[in-house]
Amino acid sequence: MTILSAITSISRPNKSSKSVISSNGGSSLSMGSNSVSCFNACGGGSSYSYSSSYSGSGLDYSYKANYSSSTGYNSSVIIASSTCHCS
């Protein structure tokens, strides 16, 4: 499976950045790949959260995730595109 990702530069003072992740054939992506993309977009901070939604081919996906250095991951489902909120 080929995973393509593009991370745009931080465009808002509140350190909110956007990460776009896609996969061939709508295959699900691993939590690890998503986390790394958001982690890098946030500059490697100790915590972040992001959410996304995707609609295509009659299927709707949604994904929400939170990461904290003290509690670890809290995540679910599939991600196609996301907005990272850095803290």
Swiss-Prot record:
Compositionally skewed regions (Polar residues) per UniProt: 1-13
Pfam family, one: Coiled
InterPro entries documented for this protein: HssA/B-like_chaperone, HssA/B-related
Regions annotated as coiled coil: none
GO biological-process terms attached to the record: sorocarp development
Segments of skewed composition (Low complexity): 14-31
Record region (Disordered): 1-31
Similarity field: Belongs to the hssA/B family.
PANTHER family: HSSA/B-LIKE PROTEIN 1-RELATED-RELATED (PTHR31059), HSSA_B-LIKE PROTEIN 1-RELATED (PTHR31059:SF5)
Stated name of the protein: HssA/B-like protein 58
Organism: Dictyostelium discoideum
Lineage: Eukaryota, Amoebozoa, Evosea, Eumycetozoa, Dictyostelia
